[in-house]
């Protein structure tokens, strides 16, 4: 990883204001695929066919309905992102085991290991090549499965992080093998400068892309028995893309019109945003189908896996990356929201906790954690500053997720050093757990 998460907004392509809505009648968008009704809306849907007279009669003849069943309160997480770069963690079994033991001892409840980066995986996959350094060092290590076993027996959860989402390096084999999967700009270009590399973006609307992406996720869930999966700001559709032959034809088929030349046309944006949401709905359903089947040799279904999302700020995500994470959250397409807040000063951090989307998210009945920079490169806050930030977040009922592992007490721990910071994190987590209903 070239820089801290949350700097995705610093792009070569500027964000320009949205175009005003056209006056001409707009195409009717195709409906999303029909799936099982979502829990929050199933009761309402069941009432819609009932005639008005029946409803009025029932209102006077039946007792008041019981209030809607509320989900049990979910306790805040104390988690950390783990990556391979820059860190030797994934390549050494003894180091990996010790890291998990130290994290458990220090009060962590959830681990978010990077499992998909730069077109390669950190597990044996039939959909993509293994990360070259891991394949060279120890192709049989399978660090995600090993980490999961070690963490779960210590009472922690493991939620692998699919960091690169739908991005691929421009030179990846899949790009040359399946050029029809790649999104294009209106001028036909595909290159997307990102993290100092030339990347391309695979098409969320293409059936082949969808099957491969969901397959990457399901094989980790099935093989390693993880507790969920995480998507982030790379699970997106960049707003200037979508003029490739496949997307043009799909838009014509569904709307009877050509894609507008203006990539900021709001109805064109809405249609593409809908395609991305459709992919997430399909992933949600496939995970539910998997979890509903009995475990091998067992009689009971598996528990439902968590879909965690760590997006950028809402307005930027909605307009630039076509991510509607408010809809995804309210519609139960995601279960856990981690809002990145990497402001270096305590004052800036506190201000960002008051952003409207974050305040609104607290009312959605789902856990909302705050991503906090523990240390990366030359940016390592001292423990006093970190403590202030953590207590600000947990004081408002949020959990905290640190970026990243080596910034806790490892390579990027700063001048305070490893042993002192590890002891300080242990004390801090004991302190915040004593002030919360609990943690998970």
Predicted feature residues:
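Aromatic-lined carbohydrate-binding/catalytic grooves of carbohydrate-active enzymes
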Residues: 108-141
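Active-site-adjacent "subsite" loops/lids of carbohydrate-active enzymes
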Residues: 75-78, 85-90, 165-219, 223
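Substrate-binding cleft of secreted/luminal carbohydrate-active enzymes
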Residues: 335-349, 364-440
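Aromatic- and glycine-enriched glycan-recognition loops and surfaces
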Residues: 88-106, 132-152, 212, 274-282
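The substrate-binding groove and active-site-proximal loops of carbohydrate-active enzymes
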Residues: 82-90, 127-140, 196-211, 265-275, ...
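Glycoside hydrolase catalytic-domain groove-lining segments
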Residues: 251-294, 298-379
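Catalytic domains of carbohydrate-active enzymes, especially glycoside hydrolases
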Residues: 95-120, 224, 396-399
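Aromatic- and acidic-residue-enriched segments that line the glycan-binding/catalytic groove
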Residues: 124-135, 166-195, 233-260
